[in-house]
């Protein structure tokens, strides 16, 4: 599923919750570079490098709601690594706490044909979701509020091919998955009590979606009325 590119290429850039540092996830050389944000000089200063396992393919970093933990998704090793984060000292400190698989038990030993692809933190800060291409699934993890550690609750199919990204709705009850190879977006309701997802509607056609985001609509927003066939011909 994933073709390895050994050249440096940053896949995700995200500031730490305290806005002191910028984390650049380099999928090509298996590193997460940490830069200090020098606001006075308007520069970035490299202060640390998280050297990940060789050919693990770090792809995305997300931070817990309280800012104490970092979650890094690894595309090639199909896992999420949990790190503690402390930015109170002179330099940032990251400590590896846990590694969990993104794969179902059926494919747990078949990492070569799968690729972890999307990672999203639920608005309630209590759950983490990820997608895995190849087996085409979404997994949900419960976050321990005290330790930041993850407990997998389910890994289920998403009725699409190559789920490259996902987003959780603000109501915390629904997710949408962008399926790159099947040209669709699929939406689901999350049943936290029974640890399942239920598809809301038929897949929505979108050409080769790569990323999916959700933005609040302003109250004064006015939807543009689609042109009729006759009006379209006149344009």
Annotated model-derived regions:
Residues 35-43, 83-94, 141-148, 189-196:
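Short loop/turn segments immediately following beta-strands, especially the blade-tip
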Residues 30-32, 78-80, 136-138, 183-185:
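Structural signal for beta-propeller blades
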Residues 16, 24-27, 64, 72-76, ...:
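Conserved beta-strand positions in repeat-built beta-propeller and related beta-rich domains
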Residues 139-189:
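C-terminal hydrophobic structural anchor segments
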Residues 3-19, 52-69, 102-125, 159-174, ...:
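Beta-rich, blade/repeat-based domains predominating
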Residues 49-105:
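Acidic, glycine-rich loop-and-beta core segments that form the ion-binding/anion-interacting portion
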Residues 1-2, 45-50, 92-103, 150-157, ...:
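Beta-propeller fold detector
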Residues 180-189, 198-234:
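Blade-level signature of beta-propeller repeat domains, shared across WD40, Kelch, NHL, RCC1
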